[in-house]
Amino acid sequence: MQPQFVLVGFLVLLGLGQNARGAEPADPVAFKHARVIDVWEAYADRLTFGQGQTLALLDDGCKLSLPEWSQSDGDLPKVRVSYDSVDDDDDPKHEGRGYHGSTIGIPSSVNYKGKRGVAFNNQVAVVRALECCHCNVSDSKTLAAGLQWVIDHHERHRITAINLAPVDDLEHAEPVATVIDAKLKRLRELGIWVSAPAGNHNFSKGISWPACQPNCFAIGAVKPGKDEVHLDRHAKLDLVVPASATSSSNAIVCGTVLLLREAIDKSGYDWKQDGPNRAAAMLTILQKTGTEVHDPTSQLTFRRLDVKAALDHVFERGRR
């Protein structure tokens, strides 16, 4: 074999090894199924994977000293800003029964010791908006305050999406009117993505609040590695995503929409053909490029997230 070919082969193998070591998916099976890993490879030279965007995590607080949040392999601190709408201060530490918010941002955002979330170069805004993610509609007041904080500060902190993480673990076939509804409506008008997990109880006649509300996208799940709908499902579901829990499926799609927004901006894609605002248009893109999955339990057909297909659609039809 000629020396130059040996050298080229060595460099290729070296590069592949570095990529493998430097990009451990936060959820390998789910990321492969949703084609997140394909996107990392295909668009490595075109996307920054979240740089310049902030994802707001509205949950039950966070232990900010955890290395996943206090350290980052990226150029910027992972946590850009924090707020507690329960106590009206900037310390979102867990109190009472809180626990969930310390991990909910991992699938979307982690960038620590080689482990990566979908949009690993993003920043997060940690908002403690209630005591525990397993909530009640009585938590709507502090949730509304957290949403209002995002409305007031989204431009300063470049917040483009919200992971509205709580679930009330009930089977709502219809919306439940509360004070969060006006905030959700305003966020939709601003084009800010807001989605929530459907719930994890195998309900088929309804889903959890606040996912059941207008202007909040409801995210369900398929089993990782298999297009089989599981956990809560209902006609209200907007999208299903590979994950073992709907909180994780919602986290994955929240990271995805940061990539999709960047792709729209860089390609010059005319999103207005898909919806009246950026958030609605992005859902349309994710739905029409997603894989059809029929659910025998509910007799409904859902669209399963295919991140690569969504980005391909945008770049192939862009004006730049």
Give the positions of each predicted feature:
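Bacterial N-terminal signal peptides
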Residues: 6-15
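Extracellular S/T/G-rich loop segment that most often corresponds to the catalytic His/Ser-adjacent loop
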Residues: 59, 192, 206-267
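Catalytic-core regions built around general acid/base machinery
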Residues: 172-194, 209
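Solvent-exposed loop/turn segments at secondary-structure junctions
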Residues: 60-64, 130-134, 167-172, 200-204, ...
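Active-site core segment of subtilase-fold serine proteases
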Residues: 25-124, 130-138, 142-161, 249, ...
